[in-house]
Amino acid sequence: MAAAHSSPGFPLIAKGGALSAGARAILAMGNLHDGAEEGEEYTQPPAEVTGNDVLSTAWRVSTLLEQGKASLADLQIVIRHLRDDAFLRRATRLHRYPGGTSSSVTEDRLKGVVRQVLDTAFGRTNDSEGADVPSRTATEALACFRNELERTRYAAVFTAHPTFAVANEVYAALASYASAPEPQDVAPDMLSHRRKAPPTLEEEFTLASAAILRGRDALDRLNVELLGAASETWPEAWSSIVPRPIIMTSWVGYDTDGRTDIGWWDTLRLRLKMKLFQLQRLRQQIVDSGAEAATLLSRLSRACYTVEAQIAACPKSADLEATVEFATLIVDHKEAAILDPAVLGDALQDVIDTASPEAALSVAVARAGFFAHGMSASHSHTRLNATQLHNVIRQRLRFTDDPADPAHRRALLAHINEALESVSAVPVDFGALLVEQASAARLMMTVAQIVKHIDSTTLVRFLIAETESGYTLLAALWLARHFGIDDKIEISPLFETREALMGGAHIIEEALRSPHWREYLRKTGRLCLQFGYSDSGRYVGQLAATYLIERLRLKILDLLHVWDMEDVEVVLFDTHGESVGRGGHPFRLSDRFAYLSPMHVRAKFAERGVKYREESAFQGGDGYLLFGTPELATASVVTIAEHTFEPATRHDDPVYDEPDFSSDFFSTIADAMTGLVADPGYADVLGAFGPSLIDKTGSRPAARQSEGGGVSPRITHPSQLRAIPNNAILQQLGWCANTIQGLGSAARRHPETFETFREGSARFRRALDFAAHALAHSDDQVLRSVIWLLDPGYWLDRATAEPRSGKRERYLSVMHDLERLDFWADTQSMFRRIQEDHLALRSIWPEAPTIHPAEKLLHAIRIALIEKIWVLATQIPFFMPRGNFTREVMMQRILCLEIPSVLRELDAIFPRGGSKLDYNFHEPAGPQVDNSYSQEHDEIFQPMREMFQMMREISVALMHGIGAFG
């Protein structure tokens, strides 16, 4: 059901028969309907809610429901209308984000990329008359062209981060609407946009691989243009060029950081599927080209059949007999399955040399994609955390000191260097893999089996989360050497905490002091680094995080000079999400790349002659949207190519010209966000009922679970939440603190300079785009209304103003239960901290965006639903404790909105009962006394269930408005 009228800026639901009077009245509260019906008036709310328009609106909604002038069905209609309007606006933004999806515009942009590459190859410059003057001969230009294209410069990394926030058909509809030539004004008719269940790992893999294959198709379009231009420019030499400037990469199924539900058999099965996709793709491309290639096609078919058999035999658990059968197929038939793309190199070149020009180009494009990605549809990243590595080293080498203790750091570094001197490789087989208990060793052994039996040439990234010491990198190197694959993996630290971002250069230097690490870097030719924008954003603030990451990159560049390692390529992998709180620029994909990888840093690397590769993440369902259709995928790849081939030249920018101000400004933000994170009230407001506002959005096990029917553990620090739910909760509370906290304090310190930078610095303006978007979805009155809900005093005031004794007692009951939770004092002081900073920002930046009326109305409706659920819960009849489930526990969990689990308990305590038995039991019928609790179900439990579902649908509507989950 869609809004009758929609505009990018302001939805207006037209008056008419499609809406009930109750729905129209609710929409009118947010000025989203063209007026209430004649005679519809609003009673003024009581004094305790005046001064807060969100609570006032919530009170009016509740009053309409109580008076029978609106029903829950009316609320559901309103929520769907507002959700659908947000969906349409999100689709329009998605259309614009990669620069539009028009095929003609995309084609022109592709040709523009090719012109840029050719201009660079020939060294063309404009003469005094404006004509292009090449500075290189055709032969020299060919060498330069080849150099530009045959080195990978960018990787799109597809991850399974839990942002699968809506049903798959909703994502498909979003991508389809965004790919339409014109904005649509009628949303798809769906009762709910929510998922029926969290995605499984297999489902995540299916969605990721579909996005990757669309990305591969888009890369082929780019290569058609590049190789087509090469064939016209160098007709005798073009066919030997194998471009690979941009690649696709995945860690879906290979990421074991913080999860134990992915077995080595899962990783190998999914990796074999990616190999099969690659082989099938190449075979189909050669068939479609029309070239004569019978022998090559036969070889590819045999490889496909072999890999299919390997996949079918892959165990589903640590099953000994199944593993033996699998080993037979994967070890004994690895040559038939093809281990190295080079095996097909001569055959592919022969086909290109003998085919017609059109077929030759098609096969050359197919070969480029095949050689760029190896024996997989994408490159592979594995991931684990530093603790897992430390544990296996402690087990293998008996190092008992704690790597986190600085007092033991030097001794540990000395010990691991000694161990690297003497380490020798041990064999790896599936028997050893079956019995291995250490997760880090198991992952390294799994990688060893991949490079031995699936793909022998493509390096595998080995990402290490929570890296806090150079010791961790050397420990990973020891483990790789121990299993004989140190030349096959790219060890990469992840920097995302404030400590890691501030001390990251020291971590790298600790590793560089080891001759073994330097030897390893020279052997692989790359220093791989990963930068996390989610955790860094939530701990130091998103705007400060990017500044710290930028500084860290330049410090590492200096270290390479100090250690004479400037001939090593640096891989800069930015792990970010689609939301502003997680590093995704809100308005343009091109600005996202410029924000993550500022031209100033790129130019510094170029000036030093240090090669670098950029990588950035497309995370979960939200991230895959940019590859959700062929049109979106091609527009995204073109944007990547434009960024990748843009010459790295430094531009004047006050951010770099006045480093003292920049340092002070971003440090102030970081200090303010750090202070907020440490505030007990911040953890309280995140943990009170925030986790219950969002659905489970990934296959990764939840960090926060209720046990034994008791009260869920209280969140005492944001670190007890994962980063994505943390950020998603902030969005749902109407305050994107991770993006705007501290900005007011920083601006207040230098108001004139702040204004100057806003007007004169592209780098600064790009950062403020994040704040602008966050402010457009934040409102201090929304946050204050949440905090007031948690205040027993608010409920006492409601009780005092309530003339009906029954209702008064219910308010007092809620008050007493909230007193037991004891959120009030800390959340109030935390709010004062936030509001003071916000007032400072508004005084310096008065024209900053404000929240959309539709979003504010959604927040108000949800406040009304929460109040109604809490008050309704006070009517639940007395019951005897059921295990740990007592009435006190029940109310605490209801106040935390853990409604589904509470209702499961109540369904068991108060069974609805069955229908009357109408059978012949061969004697006079006795009275069938109805001892069921159907009235409680109809009047309490079912309304609570319906209202909770509506709250979750509101969360989806708000998420559509923001444009991303978490």
Positions of PLM-derived features:
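Core mixed alpha/beta domains of very large multi-subunit molecular machines
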Residues: 378, 392, 402-492, 501-517, ...
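Secondary-structure transition/capping motifs at alpha-helix termini
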Residues: 237-239, 452-458, 480-489, 511-524, ...
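Internal mixed beta-strand/loop scaffold within catalytic domains of large alpha/beta enzymes
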Residues: 239-277, 445, 452-455, 469-490, ...
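Active-site beta-loop-alpha junctions enriched in small/polar residues
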Residues: 253, 382, 464-469, 494-498, ...
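Often metal-dependent polyanion-binding catalytic scaffolds in large enzymes
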Residues: 1-412, 538, 566-571, 576-587, ...
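Alpha-helix N-cap and loop-to-helix initiation/capping positions
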Residues: 14-17, 339, 435, 544-548
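Phosphate/diphosphate-binding loops
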Residues: 505, 547-558, 607-611
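Short loop/turn segments at strand-loop or loop-helix junctions that form parts
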Residues: 265, 424-425, 529-536
